[in-house]
């Protein structure tokens, strides 16, 4: 989306970390792993190297381009939205949630519970070893973050509450969903 709005192939470092491991000392993709990837796919004879196809990783505050005329037209077909608006490095909901809860400093964290649930903890140092349950990402400013994620959170709860709602309605009861969620 950002590329279509600005013409720049960039990502916020937090989103970039979800795509490929980051070297937090350089605020960039982990070059050792980039080299290993290129080495592994070399026998296939691709015409590109990994860095050729990955968006540039940017930390918060870096120049991520401006809204172009073409981008403005995608957002507003009436033409009232003007080009030239500065754009920040694009981040996803996890990075946005960290900023919104002021959980971007070392030894802070946040929990987000919705359809899925995840905990984000800003680390002082790298973990001693990999854990399959933990994804390593970064804050929008490039600090290392351990993220534990589950795809199911409120989706299961919603399904069960719906079962009880349907039962109550079948029994002729009026259902207040706030009370139903609070009770269950």
Task: Give residue spans per PLM region.
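Active-site core segments that coordinate phosphate-bearing ligands/cofactors
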Residues: 2-15, 20-47, 61-184
């Amino acid at each position: 989306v950002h590329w279509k709005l600005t013409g720049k192939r960039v990502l916020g470092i937090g989103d970039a970390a979800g795509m490929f491991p980051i070297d937090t000392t350089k605020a960039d993709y982990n070059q050792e792993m980039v080299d290993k990837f290129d080495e592994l796919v070399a026998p296939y004879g691709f015409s590109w190297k990994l860095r050729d196809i990955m968006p540039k990783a940017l930390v918060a505050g870096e120049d991520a381009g401006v809204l172009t005329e073409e981008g403005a037209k995608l957002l507003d077909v009436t033409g009232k939205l003007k080009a030239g608006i500065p754009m920040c490095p694009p981040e996803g909901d996890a990075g946005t949630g960290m900023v919104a809860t002021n959980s971007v400093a070392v030894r802070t964290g946040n929990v987000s519970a919705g359809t899925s649930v995840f905990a984000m903890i800003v680390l002082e140092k790298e973990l001693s070893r990999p854990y399959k349950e933990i994804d390593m990402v970064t804050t929008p400013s490039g600090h290392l973050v351990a993220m534990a994620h589950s795809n199911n959170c409120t989706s299961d709860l919603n399904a069960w509450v719906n079962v009880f709602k349907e039962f109550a309605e079948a029994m002729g009861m009026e259902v207040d969903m706030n009370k139903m969620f609070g009770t269950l």
